[in-house]
Amino acid sequence: MPDLFPSLKYHDGLIPVIVQDAKTLQVLMFAFANEEAVSLTRSTGYAHYFSRSRNKLWKKGEESGHLQKIVRICVDCDEDCLLYLVEQTGCACHEGYASCFFRTMEGEVILPRLKDPADIYSR
């Protein structure tokens, strides 16, 4: 089976990554990865991303302990977006929710907060 890694299409050095829980298929988050982050994700088995706001590579859960163990990586038909299916430890969202998609466009919170963000990052 061919390895599509070399043919991935990055825009301004980044590729979008959608993250889903491997068991429930709940969408957990959306992030960007650069080539180094994708390579580290593949070699370590844990999700790595590139933060546009901090302009740096980061391993999900490095500070919080809320790691994302990779179960499978899928690439879309245009080879310009990735899907990480993960085993999530703790919360995916830095605001303490299981998913970053915890509210509607109207502002209604539709998921329970699992952790206080102050407790997550006070380690």
Swiss-Prot record:
GO terms for biological process: L-histidine biosynthetic process. Binds 1 Mg(2+) ion per subunit. Its cofactor is Mg(2+); Zn(2+). Its EC number is 3.5.4.19. It comes from the Archaea. One of its GO terms (cellular component) is cytoplasm. It is found in: Cytoplasm. Mg(2+) binds at residues 76, 78, 80. Homodimer. HAMAP family: HisI. NCBIfam families: PRK00051.1 (NF000768). Belongs to the PRA-CH family. This is Phosphoribosyl-AMP cyclohydrolase. It comes from Methanocorpusculum labreanum (strain ATCC 43576 / DSM 4855 / Z).
